[in-house]
């Protein structure tokens, strides 16, 4: 409370001080951050307070004489600070900082302690300059400084808003250390870290100046931030980053949080940072010198020094990243994640800019982002740097989250690092700018260089991390940072350009982070590795695109290794990693998914993720974007940053990345991230989303998402926005990235960027995406990545449109990646996604996801999973709907939920994160989320969809809403039920946790499942194909899917049920090949959703947790199913045919994705129809579908039901429990809906009817499903029957198309099919 009170007291002072100083914008932002409409005139001004303090404090007295001169000198020297003597400046700076932000002074001292005299001096000058000066001065004084200020400011600002406000002034004064910490965090994490700070600063300072300054500035900056922001603006250009930075402020809130976290991390990292800082500094300085400094500074500031350094490194590019830090500020973790995301984003943007501008910059941005992330991460970055320098240090940041992991990650990192490095060089080279390269070289080189590069590498690492780290980076950073740091660095560095990618990753993370932030953090630590990989990915992405390929493999390897390596640590990390990667990939999604999966499969996923990432990497931008997006691409905004996911970091994507683990988790920024610039743009949007999501989610630190938001988010301060942003960012990045992450998605997926809300990401809140976003955004998704929300990233998914798509895809992928199930798939998915992502990404991203994913995945079982995941991701919407519903749901939730749910689910949702986390948690969360979240997911789904599929969102949104509404309405009932249960489920999450365990186990299975799915492949493929039929539609469908998710979400639960069934029916899945196809086909209406769900389920299926989640979800499903059924009348019908054909023709993986796509399509159509005909459709559907379905599905259903009933026994117990919570009914309903839908194909009405039956059936079905073996045979038979019937029904459906009722039926059929498919 004290802090809040102080903040309340400080804000007005800061606000007025800013106004007096002429920093109107900053003042306005402060006011916005504070949430107050007006500030009363303060009788006392900060200057008065500062003066008094100066006179009364020992420091003041000692420095008084000096200060007097200094103050004047500062004021006059505002622009000069950089050159001012650093010692005196330090002191002066301290004073100035103090003056500027009371808190700052102390920090300043710390800073001065920090030793970045130059920066301090600068800072001081800046400080003195007052905020206004700060901006300008900082800018001029030292670009760095400016950046710093910016960053600092942002962070500060955020902090301020958060707690940092106090931080800013009072705290600093009072809690100088404390505030500083946070602020420092922002700034440098200085206070506590004075030295740390210093180091941080150093790093930040990198440009030493910057950093020191940063610290002081941070508080100051914070105050100044706004202004600083401007001027530093880094100003805008170099400042692109700065621009990002500016957003940072928004982030700042996040930043504040981040700052706090960062502070902690920073402290840990401080040392590392310190050393690193030095190196970085050198590095930075080398690089920075040119313009970097200012940027760096800004960046540094933002990132908190680290970021800063990174920033510095990234220089301008980083600036934004810095901003991210600001973001970080709010959520240190998030911030970090976010930062990264944002950073990424910024980075991305900057990167883009930077890249042009300065490779280094790019790097830096990433690095910075990373830094940021690190910062948040902490120190991770620092640690990372440290790590580079001294892995351990890194650990700190990461350690913080992953300290333990750190080691692991480190190892992993190392490997990765090397791997990366190897690749990186390419990437780096690719990246090329000399500076960049250099760092890259260094980086690549490595590690050694790492150290050297620390700055670079470190930064790079950071950078890479950042973006990715932001998501991945973060994660990576953690991991990478730590160890990979170098590597990462290398990668990142190498990535310079990659950076963006990385940034993207970051973003993704952010998205995720946000949501995932937590996760991320955790993940991050763990993820880090992933991150690292992702980072690499990112960098690869960025860099390479060329590199990408190569890096990819390496990365992949790395990642894999990393992932694997990190897995343990990375479990979450993995997630994160994955995430990151995913982030990168999906960043958020990945994160999320990966996290989940990863957690579960982590290794796998990690690999997958990595793969994905890598896959994504190329795409990565998308992915990374996602990731980065998250990271923004995060920055995705960051251009890539968030990219979404990673995009650069936006983070949003949440996925952004951002994750600091927390962020990651939290954020989503979760969302994650992405497209570089475009992505960026989107990512940002997404990111925020993601971010927002995430924040809610994880960080709810919006930060996480915020992260995604990173810059965007920042801009989107709204964390939620952030989330979206995250997602969006993610998306964007994704877009850029392909929005790889489409947004956070990417890693943030869309954030990922998504983060949509940063992941909508954020799942945390949203989802949990650092971006992008997550809902950043994306978040998951990237969608969320998220922020991807749109995409997943909210971006994630779609949203940001591109990103989103990408994100979505990414997210999805990420998820897949995460799921990893299909590494390749993921990769492919990712890649695919990436491509499409970029293309489709936007709207279809999901679709793309689906398609791509599926396509890619199709080949691979993993792919399938990927598909699943992807699908999930893509589906984020769809998946969201289905798997995602669980996973996706998270995703979507992230996106959608991002905020809402993400928060709630927080974990779950981080879209990306969620995804990542989700995956691990996915079941859990999924369950959890699915239920609660899902319900929300439904609602969220909309959001998710919206977010995730932002692009799609509209359709979805509206439709979805209707649908969602319908479904939601119904769903909601269940949801409510479910929520209760859902939240029970959430609690169930515990169960789910168990489930998760199961899930984990199942996860293991999942891969198998995918294989099964593969088996199913033939049919499902067709189905999927059908889905794929219309990527765009798919997208829309996907949108629908989210809706479906809603449908599915509820449906998903249903799907989950289906999934459960799938799970249960895993046998069914096994039989799935046939059954799935047939059922899927037949069930398509339901199947579609169900399939989707099932797909999700499939994904989930593998996961027991999912089953449970399914069960938990079941309730939702039934309701959803009904509506879904109703909803997807015509489309469904169409789908069935196509689905059937496709199922027959295509491989399951594709099938799944496609199915989802078709489902989405159907859903979309249905949504529209539903809107118009929802009522009629429901009624007619009820009647006709009941009849038809009863006739058609009944036959099929009967077999299925029978099977299920038979199966029930096994699962009955299981189901009972699951369903018992409420899930029972819901589940039954869902199941029945599923079964009924599938089996009976009861449309809405029937669904209703069946619901009762369904409950029993569902339960039984679930039980039955549990008995895989029995189910299988029966299922196969059933499937065959269903297929026949489905065909019949298709005919009927066609007829019914005219009639809405048919739609529902077919929808159900499709769902069933899908369920079957997923089951497969």
Swiss-Prot record:
Spans annotated as 10 X approximate tandem repeats: 212-839
InterPro entries: LisH, Treacle, Treacle_dom
Reported modifications of this chain: Pyrophosphorylated by 5-diphosphoinositol pentakisphosphate (5-IP7). Serine pyrophosphorylation is achieved by Mg(2+)-dependent, but enzyme independent transfer of a beta-phosphate from a inositol pyrophosphate to a pre-phosphorylated serine residue. Ubiquitinated. Monoubiquitination by the BCR(KBTBD8) complex promotes the formation of a NOLC1-TCOF1 complex that acts as a platform to connect RNA polymerase I with enzymes responsible for ribosomal processing and modification, leading to remodel the translational program of differentiating cells in favor of neural crest specification.
One example of a Gene Ontology biological process annotation: nucleolar large rRNA transcription by RNA polymerase I
Keyword Nucleus included in the entry's annotation: yes
Span of domain LisH: 6-38
Modification type Phosphothreonine: residues: 104, 171, 324, 860, 869, 1066
Crosslink site: Glycyl lysine isopeptide (Lys-Gly) (interchain with G-Cter in SUMO2): 126, 521, 635, 655, 1082, 1092, 1249
Cross-link (Glycyl lysine isopeptide (Lys-Gly) (interchain with G-Cter in SUMO1)): 655
This protein's record includes keyword rRNA-binding: no
Bias (Low complexity) ranges: 186-205, 213-228, 246-272, 422-435, 566-597, 633-643, 733-749, 843-855, 937-946, 1124-1136
SMART domains tied to this protein: LisH
A GO-annotated cellular component: nucleolus
Principal subcellular localisation of the protein: nucleus
Stated role: Nucleolar protein that acts as a regulator of RNA polymerase I by connecting RNA polymerase I with enzymes responsible for ribosomal processing and modification. Required for neural crest specification: following monoubiquitination by the BCR(KBTBD8) complex, associates with NOLC1 and acts as a platform to connect RNA polymerase I with enzymes responsible for ribosomal processing and modification, leading to remodel the translational program of differentiating cells in favor of neural crest specification.
Name of the protein this chain belongs to: Treacle protein
